Amino acid sequence: MLPSNITSTHPAVFLLVGIPGLEHLHAWISIPFCFAYTLALLGNCTLLFIIQADAALHEPMYLFLAMLATIDLVLSSTTLPKMLAIFWFRDQEINFFACLVQMFFLHSFSIMESAVLLAMAFDRYVAICKPLHYTTVLTGSLITKIGMAAVARAVTLMTPLPFLLRRFHYCRGPVIAHCYCEHMAVVRLACGDTSFNNIYGIAVAMFIVVLDLLFVILSYVFILQAVLQLASQEARYKAFGTCVSHIGAILSTYTPVVISSVMHRVARHAAPRVHILLAIFYLLFPPMVNPIIYGVKTKQIREYVLSLFQRKNM
């Protein structure tokens, strides 16, 4: 059956295994994943609704938050529905071109998320270090340009991937030992010289993570200096308190990345399922917890949600 699905260059379909070695537990593993995905959908949709409905939240900080919520929705929805179909219905087939599209969206929106977190760090820097110029610096025009730049950077860096993968002959078969079409998992099936794909993928990841994190850290160095120069402890606490949600979002996004990178080096001989579970955790954790972080720590959002519940109880 499989040979008939193979053309002279690539398979008509790939087969996504799921989590290798844990196939018998897929139904149970799907429960926390489904719960996390549901939370991500509800949380991020709620954030978008509140920001759109409340005119007082049409400020730079919340517009960036709306971008982050949109990206988290796309990121989780790019992989989770297909993953749950594998776990529940053993629907392992994915069209070759659908696989490339999934890969493009997955990696592009991951890059966009990093860019938006950097933009949010810039927002906090201007708000705390240059408060008198906040509204004149972060204009609607600049926010639009930042959003467009985030999209343009991601699309520019990820557009080569599908074309690089189309040129290979996949003589190692169509079975991908993963839950979704991750770039390196697909490259492993290709014959020929894949060194450029390997180098390009690693170089882009390092460029994005190192560059964006460097500027985020630099922003917080200036923020910390400005906060420590404030006269009263109450003012310092209030100023830094406005950054807590953003710091939480940064930690929720980059901590799984760091853990995954460390595990790939110190536990490179670990079973593939360990790395796959970490990769899924990296995809699901930020979209699930970011709305919770901002809902708990942001007064305006928290009060709006509480007001909705109070109306229902009246």
Curated annotation (Swiss-Prot):
It comes from the Eukaryota. The chain crosses the membrane at residues 28-48, 57-77, 102-122, 142-162, 199-219, 240-260, 276-296. The keyword rRNA-binding does not apply. One of its GO terms (molecular function) is olfactory receptor activity. InterPro entries: GPCR_Rhodpsn (IPR000276), GPCR_Rhodpsn_7TM (IPR017452), Olfact_rcpt (IPR000725), OR51/52/56-like (IPR050402). One of its GO terms (cellular component) is plasma membrane. It is found in: Cell membrane. Residues 1-27, 78-101, 163-198, 261-275 are extracellular. Its main location: membrane. CDD domains: 7tmA_OR52K-like. Glycans are attached at N5. It is a multi-pass membrane protein. Keywords: Cell membrane, Disulfide bond, G-protein coupled receptor, Glycoprotein, Membrane, Olfaction, Receptor, Sensory transduction, Transducer, Transmembrane, Transmembrane helix. Pfam families: 7tm_4. Residues 49-56, 123-141, 220-239, 297-314 are cytoplasmic. Disulfide bonds join C99-C191. SUPFAM superfamilies: Family A G protein-coupled receptor-like. Odorant receptor. Belongs to the G-protein coupled receptor 1 family. This is Olfactory receptor 52K1. It comes from Homo sapiens (Human). The gene is OR52K1.
